[in-house]
Amino acid sequence: MLATADMSDGYTNGARLKISTSSKPKFHFIAGLASGLSSAILLQPADLLKTRIQQAHQTSALLFTIRKILASPQPIRGLWRGTLPSALRTGFGSALYFSSLNALRQCIANQGALVPLHGDRDDKRTRTSALPKLSHTANLLTGAMARTAAGFIMMPVTVIKVRYESDYYAYRSIWGAGRDIVRSEGFRGLFSGFGATAIRDAPYAGLYVVFYEQSKKNLNALNFGGLTTARPLSDEPAREDNSEKQLVTSSISVNFVSGALAAGLATSITNPFDVVKTRLQLMPNKYRNMAHAVRLVLREDGVRSLFGGLGLRMGRKAISSALAWTVYEELILKAEKRWPDQDNIEQLTP
């Protein structure tokens, strides 16, 4: 995606630079993979506890669940049960998501739909984000589309992960869980709960990007992190090492806090869909479809059950999203600085 801006303040001949805010697709895939793996491994215990709590009739059993796991012969292993499918799902899911998100945003921007959020025009000499600046509507749509596509591809891993984490099933291995699902439910079983997952993830991802970009705008306006100036682009290195360190620290702080705030807001709005999705994936024979699951959950467990695991999910999402997006953005910016794409900068004459 190319965004052309006047750069006469740095060029006496009045020439303009056409600067691409895009980067190589492999950068986004690798950065997404690294960010997803790190957050999945570190926060697996919280994800496991959330799955256990959202099981039927256990919406207030957090302490009981923790005590039960800690009293087992291998408590540490029990807390990290299901780490492999979770890491595969989150790692490759994040890689696919960030790659798709970047491609969609470039496509929209190339069609002339680039609408900066940070004022009428961004300072093209500097930027803190690996993402282009789009309108709120474009942020919402691209986030939702990218998450839905990645979620569909990774759905079989998600189903296996949820079944393996739950204590409803006595699976001894991940591969055994997959074989049992296919044998008893067919390949369709590997996509149990996709409707609820898509309805949860699409608005979550869309709202997240909107809240994330808006939070960064507000924090920068408040001089959060002690510095309002963004870091230089790779073709304009910092003149002083101290300034560069301040720029890096400031952008990391803004990205991390923005990620946590955005995740908290988006999670609280979409948690009922997460509960329904978990029930569908755990008990497909009991719940025929999403609408049927909602009716049964409300009748048997009440409205409160739709917010089961909200505290855990909100805490986990806030930390994991903040970590994942901060790592992703930093890796992209460092990759662009170390391996600049010469095709991204084109000298133009007026």
From Swiss-Prot:
The keyword Mitochondrion applies. It comes from Ajellomyces capsulatus (strain NAm1 / WU24). GO terms for cellular component: mitochondrial inner membrane. It is found in: Mitochondrion inner membrane. The chain crosses the membrane at residues 29-54, 82-108, 140-165, 193-216, 254-280, 309-327. This is Mitochondrial glycine transporter. Pfam families: Mito_carr. Solcar repeats lie at residues 23-107, 134-218, 250-334.
